[in-house]
Curated annotation (Swiss-Prot):
Organism: Dictyostelium discoideum
InterPro entries tied to this protein: DnaJ_domain (IPR001623), DnaJ_domain_CS (IPR018253), J_dom_sf (IPR036869), TPR-like_helical_dom_sf (IPR011990), TPR_rpt (IPR019734)
An annotated GO cellular component: endoplasmic reticulum lumen
Record protein name field: DnaJ homolog subfamily C member 3 homolog
Glycan-linked positions: N51
Domain J: 390-457
Amino acid sequence: MIVNKKYFLLICIIILISINCLVLAKDEIENFLKEGDDLVSKGKYDLANENYSNAIDLIGSDTQHPQYVSLLFKRAGIYHQKGKNILALSDLNRAIEANPDNIHARLKRAKIQSSLGRFEEAMDEYKRVLKIRPDNSQAKQQIEKLKKVEQQLEKVRDMVKVEKNYKDSIAILLDIQSVVSDLKEVRLMLCECFFQQGDHRKVLDETMTILKSEPSSVAALYWRGKTFFSMGEKEIAMKFLKEGLKFDPDNTNCRAMIKTINKFEKSTANAQELFNQQKYQDALGQIEDALEIEPNSPTHSTPLYLLKCKCLLKVKKGKESIEACNRALELDELNADALYNRAEAYMYEEDYQKALNDYNKAREHKPNDPQIHDGIRRAQKAQQMAKRKDYYKILGIQKSATPEEIKKAFKKLAIKNHPDKSTETDKEKAQQIYMDINEAYEALKDEEKRKRYDMGEDINDPHGGQGGQGGGFGGFGGFHGFQGFQGFQQGGGGGGFQFHFR
């Protein structure tokens, strides 16, 4: 009898201890829940997640606990906010298993399934919601939106991968993203479109978002590396590309990009060296190889187009030189060197007003640059020279004509255009032509006058004089040691202009 009393007392003590533990556990769960909610309101999600997890651990396998579903739902929300969608789905699956009629958990699960590209599963989930709550407007709206997203995705994949229509694709992708914000495929297509449009900052933003939730995303690491290289950050680019190869050693994109970077650097260095060696055609070949890799990078492409401009002018291709400078200025409209060298190309093409305009624009960015000031002076002088009578053109001879060739040309033209051979109606015009022929001959037959004329002096202007440096226009070297080149004739009467590079 005494033994039975002892057992009874022991059982009572155990029951009391258990009740006390349950009360303590309940209080602790409530405290973890309350503290977790407070931390969420302060934006401290990691700490909140710890509190929710502690509460869930205390509940254990008691799926009927009144806070069980709520805690799982809240922790799933944090996982989703952190981009940890698989963990979020795991918690939501447990919550729905405990309470199949929980609409909020089902809507959240459908949203995450959509973000993972599991559209069919998401549609089924929304349909289950409608079976529970036929009037649920959110489920109805999302079903229609997902149908549209599926159509848009099919269309935009073709636009990006086949048509290469990056500009128009961006609007569609952003529209899709407004419905399924975390869909990785959409973010990666946006990376490609933003990169091709030159919006490097947005590429970095998209890749950062992907890597926060999936640090091993090789595709995101590839686009991040490719973008940093285009921004001129080679070392950072190589770091991300090599990191991608750690996760996938056989990844063709990362391997190809590393090879491309090395090829680009080699072509760029070769182009510069060949230019310095005055091997301009060979330099142009290397420039084209480099531009094929990086045609639109403000950092890499601008100096290449500038070097191309100089090479083309060296081989007397003025119009193509202007086009190359135009491309440099499209990438960097404030580039004073590009403006200066385009002005030099305009000088070669005898478009002195455009040359003067570019020199003046360059001066706005570099007001104290002596080369730019000299360019302005040369363009103004060339404009003055262009207004003079072109004696060489009048006689139909080259600037290099000998005295004998000058005399021969004069005699031939004088006989052909003598006023006595003209009719009365054309006599006045014929006399003017004859006078011009005589004036040209008088200027060019005299060695001293011819020299003064070739130097840019108006020999018929009694107040003319030298007026500065004349047509020789200096001879200083340009940027990176590039020297001006000589002897390009500016029409019949131009004086052997020198062009200067920066």
